[in-house]
Amino acid sequence: MLKVENVTAGYLQSPVLREVSLQLEDNECACVVGANGAGKSTLMSLISGLMRPSSGSIMFNETSLIGLSPSKIVDLGIIQVPEGRRLFPRMTVAENLLLGARNARARPETKASFEKVYHLFPILEERGKQKAGTLSGGQQQMLAIARGLMAKPKVLLLDEPSIGLSPILVAEIFKTVGGLVNDGISVLLVEQNVRAALAVSSHGFLVERGRIVLSGKSQDLVEESAIKRGFIGG
């Protein structure tokens, strides 16, 4: 279980997040939604160890993540797929995937992990020898997610995976993401595409100006006036 409690964080003296609390249960897909600049990506950086909060706690099971290095957090099984994909464009698809399996948890199961991600994203097996930089945007996003899965995550942090993709590709990728919980992977999804994120998750959190202003079951949040008015219409 991942638990963020009363976390405040920011840059210099300007808070980006203010007293944020959320919880991700085992085998759950939850989403954090909101407009650009609301603080969603900062939350991901805090959980991944790229930033430290000024106050509050971040716990994974019984372990505090605050003060741990990003590599140690990876070893615990928390893997981030960052916004913008951040692939190695001159390396092949297979080489990019192999980089995801470098931690101690993943190395012994590299072969099985290749089989798994190729089953989830067959196009990546077809393009295994192709340079990552020559893939389409949708294929690059599939590769970024697959590289994260190569690390054998217990928790997968997905930061804005729908950016720049067509609605058809978004639906395809989100369907795969929603199915990861059946493999024992918890998913925390950060998204501006509120409709798609709520459709694939069981719980959601709406962030506005650094604060969580709404939370609950995704099916209930869809009917909230603030969600309808600001993000999905109605």
What does each model-found stretch correspond to?
Residues 12, 68, 93-111, 120-122, ...:
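ABC-type ATPase nucleotide-binding domains, specifically the catalytic core motifs of the NBD
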Residues 33-35:
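The feature captures the beta-strand-to-loop junction immediately N-terminal to the Walker
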Residues 48:
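Helix-to-loop junction immediately C-terminal to a conserved catalytic motif
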Residues 56-64, 76, 109-114, 216:
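Conserved ABC transporter NBD signature motif
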Residues 131-135:
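Conserved ABC ATPase signature
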Residues 148-149:
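ABC ATPase C-loop
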Residues 152:
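Conserved catalytic motifs of ABC-family nucleotide-binding domains
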